[in-house]
Regions:
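N-terminal localization/anchoring segments of enzymes in phospholipid and broader phosphate metabolism
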Residues: 1-237
Length: 240
């Protein structure tokens, strides 16, 4: 594809790499570091620290962004970044964003943050898009650090401090290296859907010039508008 990069040709990974790129449309990318972050106690401080250190851009996409103490800490950090001149863009799913009222959208707009709803729910004209929801949870900072996993933004992921039996235990990952370029590419796919543009991701020079790592990763997008057999096709291709 046009987004391909130079991969480890001549190695045992090359045939598997070609199968994966053919099925997913995403190339194999090197990753300098992968850090596992369990629950909000470990995830949120890391995310906010990266937001506070951002110098150029922050792209955040989440299914749920709760209007609570955790949500406020993110809003305040994102506002401080924007005040420094950082390009801050936020996507929240139109249905997931309504899961825990009061919704945070008005607060984001009032604070002047560049926030979009993914397929917002409207009654007139009726637009529900029940199955066309965005469950992706991605944050990219300066094209250098990328986050993804199962955690939304909200107090319910603070397991140690929560007395709620429905608190959500989950995992997230912080990655650095060339794989972060693909996170930005995925974000702009959703951003362009929200705003009706064809803007492309900004590939970070710091990633382009970086020495290849021994750790190789690939982004695989999933959703109701994606090929639901993509993972199955990938496994069949690998083992055939």
């Amino acid at each position: 594809t046009s987004e391909s990069i130079q991969e480890p040709a001549g190695t045992k990974l090359r045939p598997l790499s070609l199968v994966g790129e053919s099925v997913t449309g995403f190339g194999l990318r090197s990753c300098d570091n992968i850090k596992l972050l369990e629950n909000g106690e470990n995830l949120y401080p890391a995310m906010i620290a990266d937001i506070e250190a951002a110098a150029d851009r922050i792209y955040l996409c989440t299914y749920i962004f709760q209007n609570d103490t955790t949500g406020d800490s993110f809003v305040n950090a994102l506002c401080r970044a924007q005040d420094r001149g950082v390009d801050v863009r936020i996507i929240i799913d139109g249905l997931g964003g309504m899961a825990y009222p009061p919704v945070i959208g008005k607060k984001l707009r009032k604070r002047g943050l560049n926030y979009k709803q993914f397929n917002p729910i409207t009654l007139l004209p009726p637009s529900l898009h029940i199955n066309m929801r965005n469950h992706r949870k991605i944050m990219v900072v300066d094209g250098k650090a990328g986050y993804t996993g199962g955690q939304n933004i909200g107090d319910r992921h603070l397991v140690k401090k929560s007395h709620n039996p429905k608190c959500a235990r989950d995992l997230h990952f912080r990655l650095t290296g060339k794989i972060v370029d693909e996170f930005e590419r995925a974000f702009f796919k959703d951003w362009n859907h929200c705003v009706g543009t064809t803007e492309k991701a900004i590939y970070s020079p710091s990633n382009t010039n970086r020495t290849e790592s021994d750790v190789w990763t690939r982004l695989i997008l999933d959703g109701p508008n994606e090929n639901l057999d993509k993972l199955n096709e990938l496994l069949v291709g690998v083992f055939s």
